[in-house]
Amino acid sequence: MRGLQAVGKVVSPAKKQSLANGMPLKRLNNHVPQPNQIMHPFLGLTQTELGLLCCTECEPRIRSGKQIIPAMVRDPMKDQTEYTHAKLQFPLLTNISAWVKDHAMYQYSSEKQLVSAATLPAFKAAETEIPEAIRAVCQPSAQSIEGIIAAGVVSTEDLFQFLLETYPARAKTILPILLREYQKLPPAELHLEGTLHRALLAFEGQTVDKEDIEVLNRLLDNYSTEFGRRYEQVLDATVLQQLLRFYISGSALTNSRTTLQFLLKRGVCPIPEVLDAYFLLLEKAISVKSQPDLQARRLAKMACIAGCAPILKHTITATMLRVLTGCAAHTGEILHLVELAAGMPSCKEVLQENAVQLVNAVSSFAPSPAVENCTNISLLLQRLEQIYPDGLPKQFVHAASQAYMHNGNWGAAAVIWNRYGVPEGLVEIPVVNIRCRFPGFRQEDRQHLETLLKSK
């Protein structure tokens, strides 16, 4: 699957993104993706949108028919699946009701109740049995370890757990030796989980590099091969979250994404701290520097969060909302993110920290006309006023005022000022080159706004 394979590297998927220009494939322009082909965790199609879709007779579409829907689309010419931006515009009216029904069924089947990893019982490793004589001479070196193992006094598992617990700062030295010794053991003597738990604990707070990740992956692959079962199927969920932390620390985005998916399949949502780290890694790995094209960058990011819909219903932090806002391409997506955030215990703080990002996003989706941008700002403020019934925080007031003015809507800015006062720190009204004769956009509306500014 081209596109998804581009995300399959350890450090940064965007560096190998095969969709070089990020543009939708023209030969697939008229292909409407099925609901299960859409890779979007916060598309958030409302009942109103779906109802209007069924009632529209002329070019029925969703999200203005724009090619902004990340989806896996079957290319009949190449007989393969392409990962690209698609559009929800239906050429045949007869297919719409079936698509809406499939969408409802897919949404229902995709519902998954998660439990927080914070509520899981702590992993309990078996106590190591190391004789005092061995403890006194055991050192984290290949010569010392090989000599003790050859003596047959203690088990390999007990020895490595003791070393990792006693010398956590030497984990980088111990891990390659651990891999070499485990490869010598017969399957009946392999007990990876406790040792892996100790190793991951030892790496906490340390720098994880590519070599560390490769050694650990080989260790896990050997374990899976010997037992005939994938390690993610048998490891404790707490250890899986530790593994996710390890991969994130090493900037291994693909490994992190895969491990996150394993946790979700187990019905476990990582703790907020780990989720924040994952989203920050996503932002760092797929950046303007690594992928200059905006559309290709968005595709790569959406591929890494495509399965995160259950997480967003369970947990949204300020960091997550900021990164997700940067992935949005339509006001409907922003409104759905606000709706999801509104269900969180700390929703007001989360939204308040992202005031500027949310307002700037909805005010810039339409390059022109400015009227559409201002409509989007008003839609956002209407929803926010329901969340903040006692009045909008000053961050939203200031951001909305600036956005209205940069779009030339002096009248809307005046309404905000009359309700909440002139924002602190505002010293002048920007000059914008927008010609519009609608009420609120006229020169006399600007003059009225200037009067309000002078009289503050």
From Swiss-Prot:
One of its GO terms (molecular function) is translation regulator activity. It holds the Pfam family AEP1. Its main location: mitochondrion. Keywords: Mitochondrion, Transit peptide, Translation regulation. Disulfide bonds: none annotated. It is found in: Mitochondrion. The keyword Transit peptide applies. The keyword Mitochondrion applies. GO terms for cellular component: mitochondrion. Required for translation of the mitochondrial OLI1 transcript encoding subunit 9 of mitochondrial ATP synthase. Belongs to the AEP1 family. This is ATPase expression protein 1, mitochondrial. It comes from Eremothecium gossypii (strain ATCC 10895 / CBS 109.51 / FGSC 9923 / NRRL Y-1056). The lineage of its organism: Eukaryota, Fungi, Dikarya, Ascomycota, Saccharomycotina.
